[in-house]
Amino acid sequence: MTAPRDPDALIRRAGRPNPDFDQHFLIDDRVLDRIPTYADGFDRGHVLEIGAGTGALTDRLLSVADRVTAVERDESYASFLREEFADAIAAGDLDVVAGDALAVDLPAFTCAVSNLPYGVASEVTFRLLPAGKPMVLMYQLEFAERMAADPGTSEYGRLSVATQHYADVSIVETVPAAAFDPQPRVESAVVRVTPRDPDYVVADEAFFLSFVKALFTQRRKTTRNAIRNTAHISGLDDPDAVVAAVDDDVLGTRPGSLSPATFAALANVAWGVETAPGPDPQ
């Protein structure tokens, strides 16, 4: 088996990161070697990597995946990847896509493994989650903690509910700033995302997510007041009618204490009120 490429040597050959692209390249060999193992049990027939950079993780993924698609926004690094991994590309094992991961067409991947660009981590995550595929993704630690947070904790919020609507989320490793070049100002974390159907039903998914977003803008208010105060965000025409249809026990709590299932039940009530046919004209 060929030894993995040296991440520091890859940076020397590819060129220093561009600060305008918020690039922080993982250079700790031990972490790089561990990341693919967190995808054990996932279908690695076609692995998607977002933010491939100089290819240190790409190199490790090629050793465990049947095929890898690497997306890289920086054209200079995309060109370097095509040159550095020319043999893998020629063999059909690697595709390099130059472009913004929020805009390019993504392949029908079987799992995603990435050290995400932190500036677009949220947007990329919510582009990938609806695909229902397992993922191993690197985030800022604070972001990862919010993804995995439980109701009633200070970290719990819109991100927690929306992520856990699609998948089980677990932090599998915390990564220090020293593992990157250049070093970020914060710690990072590797998150394992295992898709599953929620144990509740939502009447309309887009409305559910919008409703959750709205209520968390008033997280310190009671749920009663949050529903009334955020109709301009959630799109409710008659928030008082929604409040009247919900149990007082729920209305008296704060949004931060509501489970995803309770949010779903609330959203379903609101959706039912909003879409109920009006009275027949006389």
Swiss-Prot record:
One GO term of the biological process aspect: rRNA methylation
Location of this chain's protein in the cell: Cytoplasm
Positions with a binding annotation for S-adenosyl-L-methionine: H24, L26, G51, E72, D100, N115
Gene3D superfamilies registered for this protein in UniProt: Ribosomal RNA adenine dimethylase-like, domain 2 (1.10.8.100), Vaccinia Virus protein VP39 (3.40.50.150)
Family (UniProt): Belongs to the class I-like SAM-binding methyltransferase superfamily. rRNA adenine N(6)-methyltransferase family. RsmA subfamily.
Protein name: Probable ribosomal RNA small subunit methyltransferase A
Keyword vocabulary terms for this entry: Cytoplasm, Methyltransferase, RNA-binding, rRNA processing, S-adenosyl-L-methionine, Transferase
Record's GO cellular component terms: cytoplasm
One MF annotation (Gene Ontology) recorded for this entry: RNA binding
Enzyme Commission code: 2.1.1.-
Disulfides per UniProt: none
